[in-house]
């Protein structure tokens, strides 16, 4: 299950509710660690459900979230800054692909990649590996360049592999 602490929601308006959901990470830096709860978020409107993973290691919470919400239209998923030593707080690309499938996402936009590298992998490895891991999944992998618009409802929109 998701635990009572995560059964929080904020009704922003009649057309937007934000749900606070689990993630597997930590909060803070230095001596002020874990004084706040880390989390992921589901944005629910009458038209669609958009999930934002935040930083998270892979875990059963993704499947539980997918089951609770009956899938998601768009999942914005962490995909980068991973290392075997950080596996409990940052997903490797194959785990991002599986977490997206666990959510029953229709479309996935990877985040946390293609910019400054804090881990030992190359800047483009997260996208290369996620593209490979997503080939047999039931979601559309959307990989816009920085600033490129994404039309969530347009199932014909395609993006070039700009990281190659």
Enumerate the language-model features and the residues they cover.
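Cap/insert and terminal regions of metallo-dependent hydrolase folds
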Residues: 57-146
